[in-house]
C-alpha cells in the first residue's frame, strides 16, 4: 500500500469518505456523506477497501489556456441560457415605456390617453420571477431524470411556448401575463441546470471562470435587449415589442441547436451505466485521451460516489435539513447569497432604468440604458478574471463595500437635488449626469463581483446527493426577491423616490458582514474538497488557509481553523 493510501486509511475515522477520494475534479459536486446514512459511511469504507489500488489516483494536470478552447466553447453554449434570461430583463424594461405596449395592455384615462397602473406594471414585470422560482424547483429535476442536456432542451422549449403566447397577445394584458409566467418556468429551469452542467464538465482550474460565463451571457442579453428596444422605439405599432420577443424565440432555437454539440455530464453518464461515454466527456473537457490513466481515475471517483448514493437510497427533501454534514448550513448560505444578490439593488436599474432616468430629466433614457448595458457587459469580463485570481470571498467583500459607496452617492444626489424635503423639485441635468456616472460605477462593481459569484458559489457548494434540490431552492430565493423588488418598486419609488437607494445601501452593509462570517473560500478546490471543508467545520474567515487532508504537512493544525476566541474587531481586521 502506498503512503498516501495508508494515510487515508489511518484518517478514515475522523474524515468523511470524500477525504479518501482523489483531489481530482469529478463532475459531481461532492462525494457526499449524509446525515441519515451512517450505514452509507460503513458501506463506502468497505467499497474503498475493495478498491484500494484505485485510490492511488493520477491527477489530470493543468494545461495552457489554449488547451481548454473546446470545453470553453461548449460551456459558453450552455451558458447561453443566461443570454435568454438577460434578453427578457433588457427588453421588458423598455416595453413598459413604449406607446403601443401601453395602449394595448394599459388602461384609459378620461382624456383618452393610455397608461399602465403601478399594479399592472409591477405584475407584468415581476411575475416572470415567480414563474422562474416555480420552474427552478420543479423542472430542475429533469436534469436528474433525463440528463442535464435533455433537461435543458426541455426547459428551453417551455420558454418558447411562453414567448409564443406573449407574441400572440392582442390587447388582453392577462394573456401576456400568462405567457410571462410560462416563459419564467423555462428560465427557472435554465438557471439551475446551466450552471450545474457547466460545473460538472469544467476542469477544476477554470471552473469558476466558466460558471461565471453564465452571468456574462446574462449581461450580454440585457445589453442587446436594450439596443433592440432603442432600435424599435420609433415605430408606432406592435413592432416596438413583438420584434424583440420574436428575437427571443430565435435565441432559444439557437440554444437548442447548440446543445447537440455539448458533452453530457460525466456524473449522469456513470449513473446510467454509460462508462465509455463518461470517459469521452471527461477527456474532451480536459483535452486528454479517453485512455489516459487520469481519466480512468476520475471515472473511478465518480463510480465510487454513485455507488455510495445507490447504497444510501434516494435523497429525500427532508435530508436538506441535515446539520451533521452541514447540508442545512450550506443551503442557508446559498439561499442568503442568492437573496442578497437581488437586494444589492441591481434590478432596480435593470427593470426600471428607463423610468428612473426619465425622472431625472434626461432627454433619451433609452440611450442611457444602452450605456448602462455596455458597462454591465464589459465589466463582467473583469469579473471572470477576478473570481479565479482573488477568490470568491474576497471579491464578494470588495464588491459589497464599493457598491455601498456608489449607492450612497446615487441616493444622496437624488434626495438632495431632485427630492428635497420629500417633494419632487423638477429635474437637473447635472444631478442626472452625476447619478448616471455613479450608477456606472455601481454596475462595474456589481458585474465584477456579486453578479457572477453567487452562481459559482452555489454550483460548487452542495453535496452531490442533494445538489439539484438545494440549488433549486437557493435560486428560487433569488427569483422571489426579484419578484418582490420588481412588483413593489413602483410603489416604493412613488412614496420615497430616491430614498429607496438607502434601503439597498443597508442591505449592502449587511451583505458585507454576512459574507465575512458565513461564506467560506472555495477557490482552487475540487468539488470533493469543498465538501470536506464544510464537514470539518472550518470558520469562513479562516477558510483561505485551509488545506485538503491529502496535502497537509506534519505541522498543519486543523483545529486552529475551527476555533477563534478573538474579539469581534480582531476577527475582521486582525492578521489572518
Swiss-Prot record:
Residue stretches of biased makeup (Polar residues): 25-37
Residue positions the entry lists as glycosylated: 425
Major localization class: membrane
Signal peptide: none
Keyword Cell membrane: yes
Key words of the record: Cell membrane, Glycoprotein, Isopeptide bond, Membrane, Repeat, Sugar transport, Transmembrane, Transmembrane helix, Transport, Ubl conjugation
Protein's organism: Saccharomyces cerevisiae (strain YJM789) (Baker's yeast)
Regulation of catalytic or functional activity: Xylose uptake is strongly inhibited by glucose.
Name of the protein in question: Low-affinity glucose transporter HXT4
Miscellaneous comment in the UniProt entry for this protein: Glucose transport is thought to be mediated by two kinetically distinct systems, a glucose-repressible high-affinity system and a constitutive low-affinity system.
Keyword Transport assigned: yes
Ranges in the topological domain labelled Extracellular: 88-122, 171-180, 229-242, 364-369, 416-437, 497
Matches recorded under SUPFAM superfamilies: MFS general substrate transporter (SSF103473)
InterPro entries, sorted: MFS_dom, MFS_sugar_transport-like, MFS_Sugar_Transporters, MFS_trans_sf, Sugar/inositol_transpt, Sugar_transporter_CS
A cellular component term, taken from the record's GO annotations: plasma membrane
Location within or outside the cell: Cell membrane
GO molecular function: carbohydrate:proton symporter activity; D-glucose transmembrane transporter activity
PANTHER family on file: GALACTOSE TRANSPORTER-RELATED (PTHR48022:SF75), PLASTIDIC GLUCOSE TRANSPORTER 4 (PTHR48022)
Membrane-protein topology: Multi-pass membrane protein
Pfam (any one): Sugar_tr
Family that this chain belongs to: Belongs to the major facilitator superfamily. Sugar transporter (TC 2.A.1.1) family.
Spans through the membrane: 67-87, 123-143, 150-170, 181-201, 208-228, 243-263, 347-363, 370-387, 395-415, 438-458, 476-496, 498-518
Amino acid at each position: 500500500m502506498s503512503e498516501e493510501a495508508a494515510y487515508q486509511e489511518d484518517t478514515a475515522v475522523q474524515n468523511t469518505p470524500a477525504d479518501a477520494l482523489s483531489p481530482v475534479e469529478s463532475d459531481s459536486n461532492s462525494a457526499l456523506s449524509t446525515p441519515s446514512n451512517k450505514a452509507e459511511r460503513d458501506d463506502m469504507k468497505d467499497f474503498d477497501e475493495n478498491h484500494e489500488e484505485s485510490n492511488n489516483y493520477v491527477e489530470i494536470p493543468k494545461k495552457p489556456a489554449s488547451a481548454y478552447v473546446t470545453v470553453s466553447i461548449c460551456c459558453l453554449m450552455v451558458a447561453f441560457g443566461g443570454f435568454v434570461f438577460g434578453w427578457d430583463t433588457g427588453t421588458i424594461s423598455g416595453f413598459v415605456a413604449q406607446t403601443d405596449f401601453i395602449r394595448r395592455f394599459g388602461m384609459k384615462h378620461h382624456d383618452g390617453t393610455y397608461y399602465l397602473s403601478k399594479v399592472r406594471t409591477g405584475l407584468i414585470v415581476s411575475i416572470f420571477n415567480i414563474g422562474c422560482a416555480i420552474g427552478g424547483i420543479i423542472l430542475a429535476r429533469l436534469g436528474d431524470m433525463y440528463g442535464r442536456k435533455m433537461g435543458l432542451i426541455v426547459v428551453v422549449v417551455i420558454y418558447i411556448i411562453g414567448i409564443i403566447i406573449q407574441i400572440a397577445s392582442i390587447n388582453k394584458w392577462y394573456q401576456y401575463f400568462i405567457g410571462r409566467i410560462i416563459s419564467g418556468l423555462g428560465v427557472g429551469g435554465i438557471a439551475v441546470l446551466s450552471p450545474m452542467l457547466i460545473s460538472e464538465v469544467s476542469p477544476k482550474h477554470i471552473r469558476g471562470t466558466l460558471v461565471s460565463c453564465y452571468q456574462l451571457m446574462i449581461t450580454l442579453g440585457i445589453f442587446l435587449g436594450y439596443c433592440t428596444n432603442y432600435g424599435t422605439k420609433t415605430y408606432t405599432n406592435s413592432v416596438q415589442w413583438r420584434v424583440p420577443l420574436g428575437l427571443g424565440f430565435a435565441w432559444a432555437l439557437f440554444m437548442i441547436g447548440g446543445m447537440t454539440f455539448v458533452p453530457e455530464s460525466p456524473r449522469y453518464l456513470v449513473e446510467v451505466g454509460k462508462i465509455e461515454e463518461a470517459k469521452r466527456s471527461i477527456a474532451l473537457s480536459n483535452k486528454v485521451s479517453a485512455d489516459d490513466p487520469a481519466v480512468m481515475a476520475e471515472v473511478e471517483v465518480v463510480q465510487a460516489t454513485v455507488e455510495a448514493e445507490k447504497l444510501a437510497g434516494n435523497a429525500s427533501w427532508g435530508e436538506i435539513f441535515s446539520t451533521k454534514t452541514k447540508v442545512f448550513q450550506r443551503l442557508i448560505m446559498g439561499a442568503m447569497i442568492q437573496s442578497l444578490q437581488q437586494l444589492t439593488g441591481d434590478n432596480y436599474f435593470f427593470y426600471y432604468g428607463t423610468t428612473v432616468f426619465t425622472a431625472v430629466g434626461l432627454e433619451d433614457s433609452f440611450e442611457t440604458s444602452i450605456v448602462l448595458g455596455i458597462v454591465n457587459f464589459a465589466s463582467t469580463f473583469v469579473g471572470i478574471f477576478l473570481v479565479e485570481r482573488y477568490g470568491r470571498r474576497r471579491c464578494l467583500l470588495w464588491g459589497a463595500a464599493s457598491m455601498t459607496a456608489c449607492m450612497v452617492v446615487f441616493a444622496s444626489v437624488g434626495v438632495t437635488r431632485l427630492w428635497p424635503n420629500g417633494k419632487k423639485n423638477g429635474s437637473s441635468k447635472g444631478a442626472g449626469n452625476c447619478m448616471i456616472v455613479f450608477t456606472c460605477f455601481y454596475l462595474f462593481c456589481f458585474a465584477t463581483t456579486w453578479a457572477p459569484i453567487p452562481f459559482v458559489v452555489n454550483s460548487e457548494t452542495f453535496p452531490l446527493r442533494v445538489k439539484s434540490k438545494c440549488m433549486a431552492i437557493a435560486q428560487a430565493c433569488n427569483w422571489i426577491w426579484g419578484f418582490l423588488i420588481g412588483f413593489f418598486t413602483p410603489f416604493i419609488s412613488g412614496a420615497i423616490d430616491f430614498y429607496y437607494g438607502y434601503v439597498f445601501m443597508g442591505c449592502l452593509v449587511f451583505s458585507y458582514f454576512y459574507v465575512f462570517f458565513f461564506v467560506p473560500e472555495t477557490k482552487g478546490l475540487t468539488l470533493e474538497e469543498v465538501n470536506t471543508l464544510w464537514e470539518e467545520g472550518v470558520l469562513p474567515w479562516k477558510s483561505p488557509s485551509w488545506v485538503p487532508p491529502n496535502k497537509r504537512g506534519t505541522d498543519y493544525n486543523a483545529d486552529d481553523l475551527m476555533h477563534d476566541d478573538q474579539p469581534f474587531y480582531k476577527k475582521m481586521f486582525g492578521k489572518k
